[in-house]
């Protein structure tokens, strides 16, 4: 793959498609009507801003954004600094403590340092109405994020997809397992984590796969940005 290929090159044309324009128009109309929509407009596409196409090493697929105040900021499972880690992220940390030597559970849930190392934290739906989980399902976001997975599938090799839960695993059916790696487990939600997410060792497995490809492993210890 040419390192010059960007998200803009491979999915930029989606912005011109009617389904995409309709999705953005719906979200804009909901905001104008006074509804609170998460994440803020400026953060919707943060995953792509922070992890460029040629930098992607790992994909962690989420469902839709957190729907509480100050949580969602465009990265799956991550919350803004100063907000307690939600239960699913708490279970991700619990798994990291047992899987990665020296991992210490952080006192925050801000995963931007993962994104900056090549972990694409992608939700399948990119907006949600406050307090209403899955309220923006089937608007058109799923079509867009399918195109993202197709682009990764076609233009990259050796990407590690972590697919947690049936929703992510269905979404991942299009991934070519001869070119990429798929790690599957139940969702880290408290409802299902004990069924095999805890103990899945996906984080150490991902680093082993990266090292086998002569790539830098991920430092899974989330770092807060230095205060200016």
From Swiss-Prot:
Belongs to the uracil-DNA glycosylase (UDG) superfamily. UNG family. InterPro entries: UDG_fam1 (IPR002043), Ura-DNA_Glyclase_AS (IPR018085), Uracil-DNA_glycosylase-like (IPR005122), Uracil-DNA_glycosylase-like_sf (IPR036895). It is found in: Cytoplasm. Keywords: Cytoplasm, DNA damage, DNA repair, Hydrolase. This is Uracil-DNA glycosylase. PROSITE patterns: U_DNA_GLYCOSYLASE. Signal peptide: none annotated. One of its GO terms (cellular component) is cytoplasm. It comes from Yersinia pseudotuberculosis serotype O:1b (strain IP 31758). The active site is at residue 64. One of its GO terms (biological process) is base-excision repair, AP site formation via deaminated base removal. Its EC number is 3.2.2.27. Gene3D superfamilies: Uracil-DNA glycosylase-like domain. SUPFAM superfamilies: Uracil-DNA glycosylase-like.
């Amino acid at each position: 793959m040419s390192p010059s290929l960007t998200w803009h090159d491979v999915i930029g044309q989606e912005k011109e498609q009617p389904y995409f324009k309709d999705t953005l128009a719906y979200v804009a109309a909901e905001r104008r009507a006074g509804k609170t929509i998460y994440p803020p407009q400026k953060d919707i596409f943060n995953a792509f801003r922070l992890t460029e196409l040629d930098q992607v090493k790992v994909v962690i697929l989420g469902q839709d954004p957190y729907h509480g105040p100050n949580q969602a900021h465009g990265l799956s499972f991550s919350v803004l600094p100063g907000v307690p880690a939600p239960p699913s992220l708490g279970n991700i940390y619990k798994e990291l403590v047992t899987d990665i030597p020296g991992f210490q559970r952080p006192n925050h849930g801000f995963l931007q340092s993962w994104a900056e190392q090549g972990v694409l934290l992608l939700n399948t739906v990119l907006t949600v109405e406050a307090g209403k989980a899955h309220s923006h399902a089937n608007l058109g976001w799923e079509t867009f994020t399918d195109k993202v997975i197709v682009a990764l599938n076609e233009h990259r090799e050796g990407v590690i997809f972590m697919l947690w839960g049936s929703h992510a695993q269905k979404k991942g059916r299009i991934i070519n397992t001869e070119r990429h790696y798929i790690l599957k487990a139940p969702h880290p939600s408290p409802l299902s984590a004990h069924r095999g997410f805890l103990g899945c060792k996906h984080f150490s497995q991902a680093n082993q796969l990266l090292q086998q490809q002569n790539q830098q492993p991920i430092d899974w210890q989330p770092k807060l940005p230095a205060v200016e």
